[in-house]
Amino acid sequence: MAESDGVEFFANRAQSSMADNKNSVLRCTFSAPSHSSTLLRGLSALRDQGQLLDVVLAIDNERFEVHKAVLASCSDYFRAMFTGGMKESNQNTIELIGLSARGLKHIIDFAYSSEVTLDLDCIQDVLGAAVFLQMVPVVELCEEFLKSAMSVETCLNIGQMATTFSLSSLKQSVDAYTFRHFLQIAQEDDFLHIPMERLTFFLQSNKLKNCSEIDLFHAAIRWLQHDASRRTVASEVLCHVRFPLMRSSELVDSVQIVDIMVEDVQCRHFLLEAFNYQILPFRQHEMQSPRTSIRSDITSLITFGGTPYTDNDRTVSSKVYFLPDITVRQFKELTEMEMGCSHACVSVLDNFVYVVGGQHLQYRSGEGAVDICFRYDPHLNQWLRIQPMQESRIQFQLNVLDGQLYATGGRNRSGSLSSVECYCPKKNEWTNVDSLKRRIWGHAGATCGDKLYISGGYGVSVEDKKTLHCYDSALDQWDFKCPMNEPRVLHAMISANNRIYALGGRMDHVDRCFDVLAVEYYIPETDQWTTVSPMRAGQSEAGCCLLDKKIYIVGGYNWHLNNVTSIVQVYNTETDEWERDLHFPESFAGIACTPIILPQTTTQR
C-alpha cells in the first residue's frame, strides 16, 4: 500500500510538472495595433459628447472642457499642474495666460487626435502654445512645417521664430537657406527690419553663396538708409564688407559716391584701406585682415603645369586645374599661366600662390632651369611677376617659414646647387642664407613648427639619398637629423599632425631605376622615423599636398611602367589607408600642387 501511494505521488508530481512546462511554453503576449487609435477616437468622442470631462481651461474669453488625464499624459506642463500638488489641481476652471486661444485649441485637438493642421497664419500661435505647454511632438511638427515652408519671402520671419523659441535645428536651416539666397532675401521688405546682429552675422560669414562684395555693400547700405538712426552703427555693419576685394572701378563708381563712406571717419578708413591694398601689391601681406580674406569656406586643390615627357616635343603645360572640394572626384580647368612650366615649386602665403622656377621647355637635365617667379591671386585670377631668384633652379624645394619663402638646392645648367635663397614679400627681394652642407637636387622639403626639413635627393654619395637636413631660421643654420629608412630621390614630403611624411620617389640601382613604395614619417620631438602603409603604385616627380587630413599625390613618373601617369593616390593620415579612385586629366610629371581657398563663384561654376 505504501509503495502504491509512492508511485501515485510521483506520477501526480510529474503530470503537474508537464502541465507547468506546457503552460510556460504557451504563454504569449499579444498586441492590438489599432488599440491606440481606437483609444484616441474613444477619448475624442467622450469630449465631443461632454462625458467625464473634469476641468475647464479658460483663455481670452474662450473655454475648453477637457479630461485632465488626457492632457497630463502628453504635456509635462499639465502633468506638473495636475499631479504636482499645485492649487490648480483642485480647481474646476483654470485661467491660462502666456498663449493664445487659437494655439491652445490646436494643442487640445492634437492631444485627442495626434494630428495638427498648420499654415503660415496660425503657426506662430501653435508653436508658442506647444513650447509653453511643453508639447514636444507638436514643436517638432511645427519645425518640420516651417522648414518645408522656407522661401525668400518667409525666411526672415521663420528665423525670428527660431530665435524666439530657441529652436536650434530650425535656426540652422534658416541660416543655410539665407546663405544660399542672401541677395534675393535682401530685396524683401522684411530685410529692412532684421536686427543689426543678424545682419552682421551674415555679412561676416564665409558661407554666403554667389555674392560679390559690391552686392553685399549695396544690401548693407539699403538696410542702413532705411532708418536714419542707423548711421551711428554704419562702421559696425560695413566693417564686414570686404572692400579690398572689390574692383577698383567699383570702389570709384559705386562706393566712394555714397555719402556715409566719406562722412563717417571709420568708413572712410575702409575705403582708404581698399585703395592702398590695390595700389601696393607687394605690401598686401602686411595689410592682411578679415576684409582681405576670400569669402569662401572651401579649400580646393590646385595644380600648375607639368610635362608629358615626350621625346619629340619640348612642350610643357600652362594649364591650371583645380579639384573643387574633397567630395568632387573630377578636376576642372581653372585658368592658364602666362607661360607653360614643369617642375616649378609652389608655396602659399596669405592665400597667394607663389610659382617659382622650374623649366619652360622640357629638358631631362637642368639645362632648362629658369629663375622666373610669379604670384597668383585666386580672388582676382591675376598673375603678378615678382623679383626673380638669384639662381635658376629646377628640381629644388620651395617652402614657407616665418612668413618668407625659402628656395633650397636644385640644379641648373651649371650643375647641382647648395645655395639657399630667402624671399621677403614686403621687400620683393631674394637674399642668400646659410647654404646646405652639400650640393643636392631631386630632394623633398617641408616645414614643421619653426623648422625647415629637407630629405633625400642626389648629393655626393648613396647615403645622401637618406639624409635629413634641418634649418633653423633664428640661427641661420643647417643641421643633420636622423636619416630616412629608405633612400629616395624625386620624392615628396608633407607635414601633417606634427609629423613629416616622406612618400614615393625612386631609387637607382646600377643602370636601372625602381619605384619606392615605402612611406615613412618623422617626428621632430623624438628624431625618429616610423614606417606606415606603402603606396599602391610608384610616383616620382609628382605633385603633393595636404587637404583635409589627406595627402594627395598627383601624377608623376611610374618606373614600373616606365612612363608618366595620371594617377592620383590619396593617403588618409588618420586611418593609414590609401585610395586610388581619382585621376588627373593628363598624364604629367613635374606637376606642382597646393591647397588654396578659391572664391565661391569659382568652385560653383
From Swiss-Prot:
Domain BACK residue range list: 155-256
Pfam families according to UniProt: BACK, BTB, Kelch_1, Kelch_6, Kelch_KLHDC2_KLHL20_DRC7
Domain of life of the native organism: Eukaryota
UniProt entry tagged with the keyword Repeat: yes
SMART domains, per database record: BACK, BTB, Kelch
Xref: Gene3D superfamilies: 1.25.40.420, Kelch-type beta propeller, Potassium Channel Kv1.1, Chain A
PROSITE patterns listed in its UniProt record: BTB
Kelch repeats: 300-351, 352-403, 404-450, 452-498, 499-549, 551-598
InterPro entries in UniProt: BACK, BTB-kelch_protein, BTB/POZ_dom, BTB_POZ_KLHL26, Kelch-typ_b-propeller, Kelch_1, SKP1/BTB/POZ_sf
Cross-referenced CDD domains: BACK_KLHL26, BTB_POZ_KLHL26
Entry annotated with the keyword Chaperone: no
Residue ranges of every copy of the BTB domain listed in the record: 53-120
Keywords, ordered alphabetically: Kelch repeat, Repeat
Stated role: May play a role in endo(sarco)plasmic reticulum (ER/SR) mitochondrial signaling. May be part of the ubiquitin-proteasome system (UPS) and affect ubiquitination and degradation of target substrates.
PANTHER family: KELCH-LIKE PROTEIN 26, LD33804P
The protein's name: Kelch-like protein 26
